[in-house]
Amino acid sequence: MGSFRHASSGAYNREKYLMARTGMTCECCGETFPRELLEFHHPPNVKKTMSLKVRSWRGIRGPNQKTLDEADQCVILCSNCHRLEHVALKRGESLLHDPSAYRRYRNHRVTRY
């Protein structure tokens, strides 16, 4: 039971950070989502030094400074925009820096299976 409370405090701390930073909004599409659908995206020019899973937000006094510093370097995206951004990056584009690319990827229809 103690580990359940400990784990949920990590989710609570993460949600507090997301609410304070973006109001639970995706920084790409601008839609509001529950915390389970928001993810931290490390831009290509930022060196990823740690994972920002819920467990890294645990702690009796909240997350440590290393976790906060890592989160501050990231972009907060919904799960859909996060996947689209990685597809775009593989193709040499970025949804975050090119609104026309965002529209193109969001409106893309799969024609082959």
Region roles according to the model:
Residues 1-6, 44:
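BZIP DNA-binding basic region
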Residues 6-10, 58-61:
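Short gly/ser/thr-rich secondary-structure transition/capping motifs
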